[in-house]
Structures are given as C-alpha cells and as structure tokens.
C-alpha cells in the first residue's frame, strides 16, 4: 500500500453497519475536513478502510466502510490518509491477482516496480478520443455472424440466472486472450469466489496469464468494496492504454452487481430510493464507470460485460441503463437454453451497431439479414405448427422451417471451457467458415441431412462426417435391438 503522510486524526462517533460517522476536532487551515472520496484508516493496525461519502457539518464526515467493521467501536481514532483509494499500475501487475485495495490474493509476494494511482479518474476528453470500425472476432459463430463485436467497443451479455453468461464470457476469454496482442484485464464484481479461482487456474494452464491481470471484489465483501473494484480495474486498463500505448481487453462479470452494490451503499447512506428500490443516482454512477472505457489515439479498451437480468425482465432499470452504453447487446434466452441450443443467444433480440454493409461488407450483411428473416418467419409459424401441425403449412413455409431449424443447430457450438462436462472437444470457427456454412444451409444444400448432423459442430463440412457416422451407427443399433428382442423371446 502507498504510504500515508497526513496526520489529521478523528474519532468514531457512530457505527451503523457499514456506515461510519467520524468527528475531526482539530480542524484548521492546515488540517482541513477530509474531502469526498478520501480514504480513512482505523481499527487495529489501521486494517479498517473507510471512504468519505459526505460532509455532515464543519467537523463531521460520513463514510462507507470498504472492509468488514467487526471490532470497530465508538471513540476509536481514525487517521486521514489525505489520499483517495489507490491501486497499483505498472508492468509488475501482469499475471497477478488483486483485491480492491491492490493487495495480492494469489499467495505470492507483493509486486515490485509499481506505481500507485487513484481509482477515481475522469473519462478522456472528446479531443483525445478516437473511433474505430474494426470487427473483433470471437471464434463463436452466432456472435461473429449476427452481432459482430467492435474492437474498442463495449459488448454486454444479458441474461437471467443460469442461462450461460459466465460460461460464454469464459469461452470468449479462452478464444480472444490467445489472439489478443494487448493486455487482458478480468474484473470480478460481486461474483462467486469459486469462479475466480477456476478462471485463474484455467488461464494459467492455457499459458496466457503473463499478459493478464485479475481483480476481484467478491460476493462476501462489503458493498463499498464491490462498488469500487470496477473503478480500480479501469485505472489499470487506463495505464496500459495511455502509458504503454497498448490495446486492452477488459472483461467484467457482473455489471448488475456493481449497480446492486451502489443500491446498497445508497440505502445505507439514507438516500430516497427510486423505481424498484434502485438508487436515484444509478445513471450517473454507471456513466462514471462506462465512460472511462474509451478509445484514444494511444490505444483502445475493448470491453465485454456480463449483465444479470433480474427475473428475466429486460425492462428492469439496471438492464435498460446498461443497454444505452453498449455497441453490441448479446441477449441470452432461457427458452433456447431449455432446448439445449448452446450458446443460448437469442439472435432476434441481440444486436450490434457494427452490422452495417459499410463495416462488415455487403455479403456478410445480406447473409445476416437473410438469417434473421428466416428465423423470424419460423418464430411466427411456431404457433400454427403447435395447433395444426406441419402438414397444414404450405411447401414454401415447410422449407423455411427446415432452413431455420438447421440454422439454429448450426449456430450451436461446443466450447473449450465445457469440454470436461460435455465430453465434446471445443471448436474455434473462423468468420469465413461460419458465413460459408450459413450460406449453404440457406441454399438448401443440407436439406436431406438430419438436423442432428448440424448440431454442436464447428465448420459446416463436419456435418458430412457426422451424418455418415450416424448412418453407419443406425444399422448396428437396429441389429442390437433385434438381438435383444430374439433373446427376450
């Protein structure tokens, strides 16, 4: 931790959960009342950290504890550090794992050759910003074809509990960190400790940890720590962008937990809640975080963020406010997850501002539009099929249904990060192979193939082998069935 120089000493006068009131009696021209966002230290060995949130009068401040307040009592002395919360930056932080205070949590010695910087920075001014129109390939078919990501943009993975947000984010890390030439930063906000440990182990085994930094503010930590960990990770990202002129891939899991932590802090501080109990300042707090994720002439920060959607309600204020900051929105569907169509991305609800002919090219754009049109027609026909059956459809509509069902299955993909659970080896598919497969399905080349031949494959040519194998296995299965029947007789 950076050394503290201030000798402004106060006294704890009130403790209510994570909210602590402190009085400073020796206020003078030399010792001023601690400004907003100043870090205070108290407790045994100064182990309890408090951030000033408001000044109540000319002698009292109110702060939120960033650490548990067990053992804190009225009358204890509080030291004003004279500095805001700071985090380490520098080449020494690569391959390491940190908490919100910049302490290492990977059981290794503290990094050397680092500089400490405030986690509270302003977004770059408009004059320094730059825009890019370059596509960032993920190796995941459905994303690259229908909702391409922007290099230097912000993409959100929206979904309720258990539809695969973290799995999809982990797969993106696996596919993109290896081919990403810059630095990758993973920021865990209010998520499970187990997931952080698993990710660290996987990245170490994959050999990509040397160009990666991890920062965690886990579920069990006080709301103040979860509220600031995103800002700390962004300070690290800004260092690599501005000082080392490198591109940064910033992965955040989960933005909803950041908003939730802000809601807890707001409630503790006694602010009047807005709709559904959210804090009245949610839009401002989210903008202060999101607007720092920006591109400048010296480098770009590409951000992928998981966003939990409470009760699958996409009109929830947390989801609505987050949508407005993103260049690509990837919506995960519980219905598709229940049908086993993984990744469970809803292609009709998901969108990307990159999906225009001038950026991705006319062929890609036309194919994406045709795929969406086919899937939308199938969605409309589902009610008729449920009531009257396929027989009542016109021949043309039956062809549309067949194409849509084959497209749905082709856009599934086995993941590297789930190999141990599914028993299927992961596939990384190039954009050209994905577009080629979709085009051939739309041209009815695979009309006579079983739908299962297109399910959980990589490139489209794998369907030939899968169909051939299924045809060989079928007579064998029938022979086994006949032998069993004969034995029973």
From Swiss-Prot:
Q: Report the subcellular localization.
A: Cell inner membrane
Q: What class of enzyme is it?
A: translocase
Q: Which PROSITE patterns match?
A: ATPASE_ALPHA_BETA
Which pairs are disulfide-linked? none
UniProt region (Disordered), positions on chain: 465-489
Carries keyword Cell inner membrane? yes
Reactions catalysed, semicolon-separated, are: ATP + H2O + 4 H(+)(in) = ADP + phosphate + 5 H(+)(out)
Query: Where is it predominantly found?
Result: membrane
Q: Where is the composition biased (Basic and acidic residues)?
A: 465-477
Q: Which Pfam families match?
A: ATP-synt_ab (PF00006), ATP-synt_ab_N (PF02874), ATP-synt_VA_C (PF22919)
Q: Which residues bind ATP?
A: 159-166
Q: Which UniProt keywords apply?
A: ATP synthesis, ATP-binding, Cell inner membrane, Cell membrane, CF(1), Hydrogen ion transport, Ion transport, Membrane, Nucleotide-binding, Translocase, Transport
Family membership = Belongs to the ATPase alpha/beta chains family.
Q: How does it assemble?
A: F-type ATPases have 2 components, CF(1) - the catalytic core - and CF(0) - the membrane proton channel. CF(1) has five subunits: alpha(3), beta(3), gamma(1), delta(1), epsilon(1). CF(0) has three main subunits: a(1), b(2) and c(9-12). The alpha and beta chains form an alternating ring which encloses part of the gamma chain. CF(1) is attached to CF(0) by a central stalk formed by the gamma and epsilon chains, while a peripheral stalk is formed by the delta and b chains.
Cited function: Produces ATP from ADP in the presence of a proton gradient across the membrane. The catalytic sites are hosted primarily by the beta subunits.
NCBIfam families according to UniProt: alt_F1F0_F1_bet, atpD
Protein's name according to its UniProt entry = ATP synthase subunit beta 1
Q: Which gene encodes it?
A: atpD1
